[in-house]
């Protein structure tokens, strides 16, 4: 059985790349889910920028956000939780970068609870100006805020 000391910690370059890839994948999936609403919003973009037209468009954007924000955040949490938990610690972005998330205590796959906690805290890190991600640059195991609290670490495969 491996310990964390036996495994190579993933580089920040690989982690950032997997983050970007995952966000692109999630954005494409969300675009497909919300296609009709997005097309309606694009069609509502004013061609003449009058104050009234801009105000109407801003209102439509607020409605879209208020109706769908919880669904969007839930989708991101489900994507990260399920793949980290059931796909050998790898989201699609991590798979492409050949890295995975493991439990810091035993170097095994994360439990459902730890994967869920990590996914929720990842959203918190994003909402707080990505500060939770920056801490990885200063910690020996390159753990982010969500890694530290979920007791996980990202390693090379």
Which residues fall in each region the model found?
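Short, small/hydrophobic-residue-rich motifs at membrane-helix boundaries and re-entrant hairpins
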Residues: 1-130, 156-157
